[in-house]
Amino acid sequence: AGVPKEEREERLKRYISMVSLNGFENKYPAQLSGGMRQRAGIARTLAMNPKVILMDEPFSAVDHLTKCTLQEELINIRQAENKTVLFVTHDINEAVFLADRVVLLSPRPSTIQKIYEIPLEQKRGRSDPLLLKIAAEIAKDINSGGQDIPNNYWGNL
């Protein structure tokens, strides 16, 4: 009842290539960078061919440049594979850049506070004015206690 060996190998080859890990197939995890380990995890998940992929803070432990690269790769993979991705993050910028919808949860116990639609194509610029507006709205809703957002907060989009 498993996946035949030939199909398994074909899937692995395809997804290793898709996440740019060609040449690293026989390396141990300790021999890979944090970003490469994240890519390997994405390839492993895709090889299982799930309808929905749950990603809980997957890029939180990598540097900013790697994070941006992985975000772009995730968008490309999501489009190529036509997968639904449920992405958990505490990073507003990441949420509005990756999502077609952002769900703001309340503190424990978590309940849905608000849903924000992102009416843009998935291929979008990080500094798109509409993204900045939605991110500011989310930040305002999170900080509804009147706390101001620093002026340079949005500079790293």
Model-predicted segments: where are they?
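Conserved signature/switch motifs of ABC ATPase nucleotide-binding domains
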Residues: 27-30, 48
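Hydrophobic anchor residue at the start of the ABC signature
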Residues: 42
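Catalytic Walker B motif of ABC-type/P-loop ATPase nucleotide-binding domains
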Residues: 53-56
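Conserved ABC ATPase "signature" region
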Residues: 4-24, 76
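Conserved H-loop
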Residues: 82-88
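Helical segment within the ABC ATPase nucleotide-binding domain
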Residues: 67-81
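Conserved beta-strand-loop-alpha-helix hinge in the C-terminal portion
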Residues: 107-137
